């Protein structure tokens, strides 16, 4: 998922 969001980045580990 290419979405700019810290929450999603943390969930994916980026």
From Swiss-Prot:
Gene Ontology molecular function terms on file: toxin activity
Keyword Secreted: yes
Statement: the UniProt record of this protein carries the keyword Secreted: yes
Domain of life, per lineage: Eukaryota
Chain positions with Tyrosine amide modification: 14
Tissue/organ expression: Expressed by the venom duct.
Keyword terms of this UniProt record: Amidation, D-amino acid, Neurotoxin, Secreted, Toxin
Protein location: Secreted
GO CC annotations on file: extracellular region
Modified positions (D-phenylalanine) in chain numbering: 2
Note: The mature peptide does not contain cysteine residue.
Primary role: Is a potent and mollusk specific excitatory peptide. Most potent excitatory effect are observed on the buccal mass. It interacts with non-cholinergic receptors. As this peptide is a major component of the venom, it may play an important role in prey capture.
Protein name (record): Conomap-Vt
Species of origin: Conus planorbis
Highest classification ranks of the organism: Eukaryota, Metazoa, Spiralia, Lophotrochozoa, Mollusca
